């Protein structure tokens, strides 16, 4: 993630995990929402994936064991991008998972909108059986 942030020519980052298959409706217009993550409330992801708590359309926490899931896609811009870049550049945080860094951002006051596009189709590929 740090390499992508450092290579950015502007203060915008679309983060997509590499083991996903999704349709165009999943990310179409994502930048219109400002800093946001895609969430899943329709059991498209396994129970053991990272979930989110949401209050008034904002993510308040990322953690395991939650019903709504983070769809492993996020868009960060402006102040959120700057903080993400700062947190990712720290060597002591290099072993943290992205969702742990997102929680640090939320604790510092960054607002991350939760978005679930109506026509989103998304699937995580863990093995050939998932195709």
Describe these PLM feature segments.
Residues 53-58, 107, 118-119:
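Short acidic-glycine loop/turn motifs at beta-strand connectors
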Residues 116-126:
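Active-site donor/metal-binding and catalytic loop motifs
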Residues 4, 52-54, 114:
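A structural signal for short hydrophobic beta-strand segments in well-ordered beta-sheet cores
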Residues 1, 20, 95-102, 128:
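Conserved glycosyltransferase catalytic-site signature
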Residues 103-117:
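Catalytic donor-sugar/metal-binding loop of nucleotide-sugar-dependent glycosyltransferases
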Residues 11-21:
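Short beta-strand-to-loop acidic/aromatic patch adjacent to the donor-nucleotide binding site
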Residues 1-13:
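Short phosphate-binding loop-to-helix
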Residues 22-92, 99:
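Conserved core of the sugar-phosphate nucleotidyltransferase
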């Amino acid at each position: 993630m740090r390499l992508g942030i450092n290579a950015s020519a502007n203060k915008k980052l679309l983060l997509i995990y590499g083991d996903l298959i999704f349709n165009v409706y999943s990310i179409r217009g994502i930048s219109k929402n400002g800093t946001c993550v895609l969430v899943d409330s329709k059991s498209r992801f396994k129970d053991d994936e990272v979930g989110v708590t949401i209050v008034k359309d904002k993510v308040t926490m990322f953690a395991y064991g939650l019903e709504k899931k983070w769809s492993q896609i996020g868009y960060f811009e402006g102040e959120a991008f700057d903080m993400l870049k700062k947190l990712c550049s720290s060597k002591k945080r290099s072993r943290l998972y992205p969702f742990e860094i997102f929680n640090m951002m939320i604790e510092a006051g960054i607002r991350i909108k939760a978005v679930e596009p109506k026509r989103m189709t998304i699937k995580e590929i863990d093995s050939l059986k998932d195709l």
